[in-house]
Design a protein with these regions (language model features):
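Bacterial N-terminal signal peptides that target proteins for export
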Residues: 1-8
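Axial heme c-ligation environment in periplasmic c-type cytochrome domains
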Residues: 61, 82-114
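Bacterial signal peptide processing site
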Residues: 19-23
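Extracytoplasmic/secreted proteins, especially bacterial periplasmic and envelope-associated proteins
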Residues: 39, 43, 67, 78, ...
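Gly/Gly-Pro-rich "capping" loops immediately C-terminal to redox-active cysteine motifs
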Residues: 53-81
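The canonical Cys-X-X-Cys-His
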Residues: 44-54, 107, 111
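Post-signal peptide N-terminal segment of mature Sec-exported envelope proteins
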Residues: 28-50, 65, 69-70
């Protein structure tokens, strides 16, 4: 008599493999990867892209709304403070030493999908 558990286990394993996926690769940016504003694009490409395009050093990827959500909940003043003073892997001034608060606000808005 055929053991019923073997075919059921096989079906379960096939479904498990078929439904699994790399969650990181599934979270693709939802918007453009370069700002429409040329001056913001220049700042982004020079100072932000190297970390935020790839998610280097736990930086939230540009356009990854899910990764940005808990940061945005802290509010713009906290995000600006972290950007200006540095926070965890984020270097002070985000390596944009000629940026001002308005520039950082625009960059954060773009990268967070806002």
């Amino acid at each position: 008599m055929l053991n019923i558990r073997t075919p059921l286990l096989l079906i379960f394993l096939v479904l498990l493999v078929a439904c699994s996926g790399d969650s990181e690769s599934m979270r693709q940016p939802s918007g453009p990867t370069t700002p429409a504003d040329a001056s913001v694009a220049e700042l982004y490409n020079r100072s932000c892209r190297s970390c935020h395009a790839q998610g280097a050093g736990w930086a939230p990827k540009t356009g990854d709304i899910q990764a940005w959500a808990p940061r945005l909940q802290k509010g713009t003043p906290v995000l600006l403070e972290h950007t200006i003073n540095g926070f965890k892997g984020m270097p002070p001034m985000g390596m944009c030493f000629d940026c001002n608060k308005e520039d950082f606000t625009k960059l954060i808005s773009f990268m967070s999908g806002g």
